[in-house]
Amino acid sequence: DRIYTPKEYWNEGKAYQHSYACNKIYRKGLFEDVRFPKGKVFEDLWTLPLLTGKSKTIATASVGHYNYCWNPKGITATAKGKELNMLLLAHIQLMGFEELAMADNAEYFMGVVNIQMDVHELTGNAPLLVGRRVNDIGKLNGKLKLKAIMLNILGLKYLCKLNKFIHKATRCLS
């Protein structure tokens, strides 16, 4: 029920929370030089920014029905470190699209920090996400606000280590 520019769609419309290709309608011409990447999971997030970047406007509608069936064997349910690392890389690519200004969106950035913490916990790999201070903490709520404060104090590397330690300690106490 709204018309967005690509920047508005990704930030105000929070497209990063629903970046699935299957529940959208596209003009055929958008796919002339855009393809879903082979060998990557979460391929929708790799592709949707390219498609929206070729569009002047994006329309959304509140009418319709999307019947999603949970698949316990699907990628969302079974993703491990390797798959979440691909998701993280797709988000890092998305933040590189300056015209979308995603890197300036504190809520989005902290969501990507969460993915980075999961990747570190599952793989032990050093963070790939470029850490930065979150200046607009006041826009965040609850756990995201606390994590942003901790990110600003500790930095990303040590926030990842603290997160891993807390999860390990919690499992030991259970």
Where are these regions (language model features)?
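Donor-binding/catalytic cores of nucleotide-activated saccharide
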Residues: 1-58, 70-80
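Alpha-helix N-cap/helix-start motif at coil-to-helix transitions, marked by capping-box chemistry
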Residues: 20, 25, 62, 85-88
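Extended, low-polarity segments enriched in aliphatic/aromatic residues
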Residues: 56, 63-64
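Catalytic core of nucleotide-sugar-dependent glycosyltransferases
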Residues: 65-72, 78-105, 119, 124-137
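Structural motif
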Residues: 100-109, 144-149
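Amphipathic alpha-helical repeat scaffolds of TPR domains
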Residues: 108-118
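Membrane-interface aromatic/basic loop that binds lipid-linked glycans or pyrophosphate carriers
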Residues: 122-174
